[in-house]
From Swiss-Prot:
Changing residue 19 to A: No change in acylation capacity. This is Large ribosomal subunit protein P2. Belongs to the eukaryotic ribosomal protein P1/P2 family. Residues 85-95 have a biased composition (Basic and acidic residues). It holds the Pfam family Ribosomal_60s. It is found in: Cytoplasm. Residues 62-110 are annotated as: Disordered. Its main location: cytoplasm. 4'-phosphopantetheine is transferred from CoA to a specific serine by acpS. This modification is essential for activity because fatty acids are bound in thioester linkage to the sulfhydryl of the prosthetic group. InterPro entries: P1/P2_N_sf (IPR038716), Ribosomal_P1/P2 (IPR027534), Ribosomal_P2 (IPR044076).
């Protein structure tokens, strides 16, 4: 991830096609050692591509992934309750163990 961040930093600074050496310099400025193998794969995968198009394509792919959006919102609301919510959470682990066997209709080997 650090390699991608350094690459995107260079692109946002105006370098449309950063080299491995450019990325290494950015990482070295933050006292981070570059992983040569990962860096070479990153440079090879992004060579000749517009980063904005790659990001847009990735966003489209992520948008099509089901995320079960209601569950995190419910969890966030419970966390805002404070100490009372923590006490209730300690009382419920036994119920969660029973629910963990429920595959919600998605059998792994069906």
């Amino acid at each position: 991830m650090k390699h991608v961040a350094a690459y995107l930093l260079l692109v946002s600074a105006g370098n449309t096609s950063p080299s491995a050496e450019d990325v290494k310099k950015v990482l070295a400025a933050a006292d981070i050692q570059a992983d040569e193998e990962r860096l070479s794969v990153l440079i090879k995968e992004l060579e000749g591509k517009d980063v904005n198009e790659v990001i847009a394509e990735g966003s489209k792919k992520l948008a099509s992934v089901p995320s079960g959006g209601a569950a995190p919102a419910a969890a966030a609301g419970g966390a805002a309750a404070g100490g009372a919510a923590e006490e209730k959470a300690e009382d419920k682990p036994a119920e969660k163990d029973e629910e963990s066997d429920d595959d919600m209709g998605f059998g792994l080997f069906d």
